[in-house]
Amino acid sequence: MAELKSLSGDSYLALSHSYTATGHAYAAARGPETTRGFGASGPGGDLPAAPASRVPAATVESSGEQSGDEDEAFERRRRRRGSGVAVDARRRPREQRSLRLSINARERRRMHDLNDALDGLRAVIPYAHSPSVRKLSKIATLLLAKNYILMQAQALEEMRRLVAYLNQGQGLAAPVAAAPLTPFGQAAIYPFSAGTALGPCPDKCATFSGSPSALCKHCGEKP
């Protein structure tokens, strides 16, 4: 610091010019970096700002045309998609309505068929179509049909048992009925023949062996 103070003003200016010349020489040595905008110093030794990048006008115009074409293509796609969405939006309510109508018609046919079947079932079940009985519900009709079927099954089972019992009894009684009666048996049951002519009451009483006429009611009556 003492040496710098001892220097005069002219000496200080000469020293500053020598530093500036040294800076120019250094900038010339860094030529490639200077062309890239890093090296050259101004008259006061300051480095200049980096030059702004320049894009060719043809490139700018081509990019503008491309962006315009892309915008038009995007607009066409948007319009096409919008028209398709609008058509789908108009078509969807019609399809939904037709589908709903078909489902309702199918359900209506199913209920009609079910009601017809239940009416036919009520017609063959006793106590279900009497004038004093109101129309049974679906569940009541099915329960009554179930009970009626069970009752018929029990009746058929009892009938089978009865038929089997009768067939077994006929098998046991057949030999007894087939045995012929002996003459003694015939006399014991019917002592006179079919060709014997019966006379008055005393004569009829006399035809029986061992039967006195006093026991005959007609013979004991007075005339």
From Swiss-Prot:
Superkingdom of source: Eukaryota
Keyword Repeat: no
One Gene Ontology term from the biological process aspect of the record: negative regulation of retinal cell programmed cell death
Start and end residues of each bHLH domain: 98-152
Gene3D superfamilies xref list: Helix-loop-helix DNA-binding domain
One of the record's GO cellular component terms: nucleus
InterPro entries found in the cross-reference section: bHLH_dom, bHLH_transcription_factors, HLH_DNA-bd_sf
Compartments where located: Nucleus
Keywords: DNA-binding, Nucleus, Transcription, Transcription regulation
Record-given protein name: Class E basic helix-loop-helix protein 23
One function term, GO molecular function aspect: DNA binding
Short name of one Pfam family: HLH
Changes seen on gene knockout: Disrupted rod signaling and profound retinal dysfunction.
Span list, region Disordered: 32-93
UniProt key word Transcription: yes
Tissue specificity of this protein: Expressed in brain and retina.
Known role: May function as transcriptional repressor. May modulate the expression of genes required for the differentiation and/or maintenance of pancreatic and neuronal cell types. May be important for rod bipolar cell maturation.
